[in-house]
């Protein structure tokens, strides 16, 4: 879409924020011992003032570089876009204002506490606003046919087989068949796995069609292909092999643990009515897993602990994806941006991913590669496939749309105790952020003018957002303010601050606790038992680990050998 609408919203947001910030700073009293001409004094000899000024100058330089880049790429430059780019300096201006105010304020630490809270929570307030403004691409109501329907779709499932979870794999296959795409390609690493998957999928299809025979609208013409031509256990390679077998306008890439609803395709495809949309993401949800049965050989406490552990990890996995739902719905509404279109299920125009340049880059993505210095970089990457595709789409002039509603929901399982790999997944996801966000911000650069709000609301925060350290810093800073020291009810204020920080973690996760069957999770895992907040703090430490190991290039949880044994066992049986 044209850059102007996103830029206008960006300028509005980044006008309101500094105005409110300056207004708040003006309310904070100055030190009465300072002379009048000292008020808001700019003293470059002060290291904090010099540092904030340097950041502001650097941001102006960065904006000029962005303008040069846009010109070199023949991007359309309008007065609105040029003006909007300079609003990227607003955060640096707000920092400088805080430094100058802190130099003259009566309660310097209150200024810094205010700055810290504003820095942490402005994006939450902005995200809430845009979340409420979301609009779904609805199906046509005028009787005219949609641009695309399910027969225009090829579904590609990169898989190593069902492993231990045949039941989930079966539901995934049946859900795809219910939506009636033209073709489903199961792309496996090698022919022997394809030979094991093929009879399983055929049996699932046979039983599914037998159950549906006699019902209304039961014409089944979905073609199923199982291929092992990838010759490599790598999701990117397997996906490309599946893409090669697509002859439809739309390719739907699906994880082998993703289960759709019966109206999934007909609800998501209307997003492509906008010819600028090339990539579509959906709402994600996590299945509530049954708790383990009591073991008579264990004590009552041990049985309770086993149930609590199972429920905890299932809930943590659910909250992880629910947070993502909130983020993508809000950012996509704000300026069309997303941190990533999830690879669990995504729809894309076939012409984008059948391009030879795309395939070559997709299979040979390196990070920190500097050819002029002889640095090959890290790669080719195995993970990060969905981030790469998201970046590719916007860098090639197409838009992204999130279809967020019940019918456009993909359901999966996370936090299974019998196949526990959630921590490994968290590590992989965090490494992906540390690899891909800097690439998007400083190599691609497109989002600075295409998704300007998302730059500051999503891409930068995901790099530095470690709640353990920010929350401790906020509490410590508050206790050093004169306001706190002089208060007669110090610990009531401190308790209120802790409660606000605690409850702020509910903003993006509340959707999970609303259904009746999930309401008890609020008590057991959020409040008053702070299991989820404690996990969030533990994740902050995990994030430091992933920063230090971002170059580790693996894909946790895709155990070919285990899956192969399972499949061969089923085949023999």
Predicted regions and their residues:
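Hydrophobic alpha-helical transmembrane segments
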Residues: 51-68, 398-413, 439-447, 470-482
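Structural motif
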Residues: 24-26, 53, 82-90, 158-162, ...
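Membrane-embedded multi-pass helical conduit in multi-pass membrane proteins
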Residues: 65-69, 81-82, 87-120, 131, ...
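Loop-to-transmembrane boundary segments
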Residues: 2-11, 448-464
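Short hydrophobic helices that act as membrane-entry/anchoring signals
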Residues: 69, 123, 127, 310, ...
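Non-transmembrane catalytic domains and loops of membrane-associated enzymes and transporters
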Residues: 139-449, 570-572
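N-terminal membrane-anchoring/stem segments of glycan-assembly enzymes
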Residues: 1-148, 335, 535-543, 549-550
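Cytosolic juxtamembrane C-terminal amphipathic helix followed by a basic/polar low-complexity tail immediately after
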Residues: 554-573
């Amino acid at each position: 879409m044209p850059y102007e609408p996103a830029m206008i919203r960006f300028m509005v947001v980044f006008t309101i924020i500094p105005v409110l910030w300056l207004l708040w700073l003006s309310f904070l009293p100055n030190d009465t011992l300072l002379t009048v001409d000292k008020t808001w004094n700019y003293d470059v000899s002060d290291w904090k003032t010099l540092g904030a000024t340097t950041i502001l100058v650097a941001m102006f330089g960065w904006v000029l570089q962005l303008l040069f880049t846009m010109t070199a790429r023949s991007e359309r430059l309008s007065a609105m876009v040029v003006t909007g780019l300079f609003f990227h300096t607003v955060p640096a201006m707000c920092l400088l204002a805080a430094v100058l105010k802190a130099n003259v304020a009566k309660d310097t630490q209150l200024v810094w506490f205010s700055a810290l809270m504003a820095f942490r929570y402005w994006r939450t307030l902005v995200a809430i606003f845009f979340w409420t403004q979301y609009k779904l691409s609805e199906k046509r109501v005028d009787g005219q046919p949609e641009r695309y329907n399910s027969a225009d779709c090829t579904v590609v499932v990169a898989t190593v087989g069902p492993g231990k979870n045949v039941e989930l794999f079966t539901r995934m296959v049946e859900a795809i068949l219910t939506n009636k795409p033209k073709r489903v390609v199961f792309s496996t690493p090698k022919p022997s796995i394809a030979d094991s998957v093929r009879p399983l999928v055929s049996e699932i299809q046979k039983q599914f069609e037998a159950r549906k025979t006699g019902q209304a609208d039961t014409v089944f013409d979905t073609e199923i292909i199982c291929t092992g031509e990838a010759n490599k256990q790598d999701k990117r390679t397997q996906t490309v092999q599946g893409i090669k077998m697509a002859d439809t306008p739309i390719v739907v890439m699906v994880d082998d643990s993703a289960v759709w609803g019966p109206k999934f395709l007909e609800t998501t495809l209307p997003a492509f009515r906008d010819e600028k949309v090339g990539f579509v993401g959906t709402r994600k949800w996590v299945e509530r897993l049954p708790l383990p049965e009591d073991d008579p050989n264990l004590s009552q406490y041990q049985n309770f602990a086993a149930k609590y552990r199972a429920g905890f990890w299932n809930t943590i996995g659910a909250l992880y994806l629910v947070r993502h739902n909130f983020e993508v719905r809000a950012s996509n509404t704000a300026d069309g941006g997303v941190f990533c279109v999830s690879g669990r299920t995504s729809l894309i125009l076939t012409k984008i991913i059948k391009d030879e340049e795309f395939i070559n880059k997709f299979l040979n993505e390196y990070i920190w590669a500097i050819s002029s210095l002889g640095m090959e970089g890290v790669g080719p990457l195995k993970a990060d496939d969905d981030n790469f595709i998201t970046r590719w789409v916007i860098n090639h002039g197409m838009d992204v749309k999130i279809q967020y509603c019940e019918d456009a929901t993909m359901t999966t399982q996370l936090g299974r105790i019998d196949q526990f790999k959630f921590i490994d997944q968290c590590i992989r996801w965090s490494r992906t952020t540390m690899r891909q966000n800097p690439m998007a911000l400083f190599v691609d650069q497109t989002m600075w003018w295409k998704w300007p709000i998302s730059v500051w609301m999503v891409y930068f925060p995901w790099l530095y957002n470690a709640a353990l350290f920010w929350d401790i810093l906020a509490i410590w800073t508050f206790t050093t303010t004169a306001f706190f020291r002089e208060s007669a009810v110090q610990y009531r204020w401190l308790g209120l601050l802790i409660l606000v920080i605690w409850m702020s973690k509910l903003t993006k996760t509340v959707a999970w606790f609303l259904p009746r069957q999930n309401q008890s999770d609020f008590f057991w895992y959020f409040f008053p038992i702070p299991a989820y907040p404690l996990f969030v703090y533990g994740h902050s430490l995990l994030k430091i680990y992933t920063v230090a190991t971002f170059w580790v290039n693996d894909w946790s949880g895709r155990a070919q050998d285990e899956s192969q044994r399972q499949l061969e066992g089923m085949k023999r049986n």
